[in-house]
Each structure stands twice: as C-alpha cells, then as structure tokens.
C-alpha cells in the first residue's frame, strides 16, 4: 500500500487517485512559476523530481484543520502558482542544502512554502525555520496529513529525525 489508509482517504477527497496524471496542468503551472524573476535575479528552474510530483499532484488541495499526531493539521495546496514569489528564498535555502529547489505550493494561509529538491525530498519553509517533511513526496504528504512533527533543518543544512 502506497499510503496509510487514512492518508489515502484524505488525498482521494482532495481529488487525487492512484495513477492520476495531469501533465497539461503541471506544464502550465511550471511555465507560470518559471516566468517570475525575483528582484535579485533568482528564477525557479524545474527539474525531473518537481515535474514528476506536479504531474501527479498539481491541483490537489487538502482542506483539513484539527489535531494531528503531534501538530495541528493545516490545509495545504499542491499549487506552485501560490508560491511564485519565492525564487530568492528557495535559491538561498538551496545553497544551504547544496541542491536546487522548486515550489510545490503552500501550507495554511501562506503560513509555509512547500518545496521539493532535485532528490525528491520535500521541505516546508515558514517564519520559524525550515522543516524536512520527507525524503519523497509520499512521505511529506503523510507528514502533512497526519500532523506528524517533522525535523527542523539546522543552519548547516542537516537534520536529525524528529523526537
């Protein structure tokens, strides 16, 4: 089973299904995001891990609010057009990690930026810090939907498993 049953149920309610592919939507949102140039000249550049994630999950909006395993479960959207002006922020965090990042969407009401790196790892960036949501999108979605506490990324770009 790809996702725990409760996670899969939430994703299905949000419009996802096993085998879902929306390449036209993914291409459109990638074009929109890549058209933006930050004041410092930073731009979003797609890569295969981002393209794969968006081909399957672009346009999935999870409407949830309530207690989770460790944290409150917040709504989130896999829609990078909601995080267009994040090129400079993601470029700076990417330099810390030593990889490129691409926006996936947002958590809450623009409370956090969701981003994927070239290796497929997913992160949340909010005013309190950066968080490793999972080594792949499936793990990150499970973290977000269950309200599991993710590990915080240290200033040197490393993290330890959450307590």
Model-inferred region functions:
Residues 116-119:
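Short acidic-glycine loop/turn motifs at beta-strand connectors
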Residues 1-111, 158-163:
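A surface-exposed partner-binding patch
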């Amino acid at each position: 089973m790809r996702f725990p049953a409760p996670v899969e149920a939430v994703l299905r309610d949000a419009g996802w299904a096993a085998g879902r592919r929306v390449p036209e939507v993914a291409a459109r949102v990638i074009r929109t995001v890549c058209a933006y140039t930050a004041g410092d000249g930073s731009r979003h550049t797609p890569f295969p891990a981002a393209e794969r994630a968006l081909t399957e999950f672009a346009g999935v909006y999870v409407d949830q609010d309530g207690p989770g395993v460790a944290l409150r479960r917040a709504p989130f959207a896999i829609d990078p057009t909601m995080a267009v002006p994040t090129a400079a922020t993601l470029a700076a965090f990417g330099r810390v990690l030593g990889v490129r990042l691409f926006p996936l969407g947002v958590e809450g009401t623009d409370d956090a930026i969701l981003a994927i790196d070239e290796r497929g790892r997913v992160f949340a960036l909010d005013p309190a810090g950066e968080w490793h949501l999972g080594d792949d999108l499936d793990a990150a979605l499970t973290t977000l939907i269950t309200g599991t506490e993710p590990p915080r990324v240290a200033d040197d770009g490393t993290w330890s498993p959450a307590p």
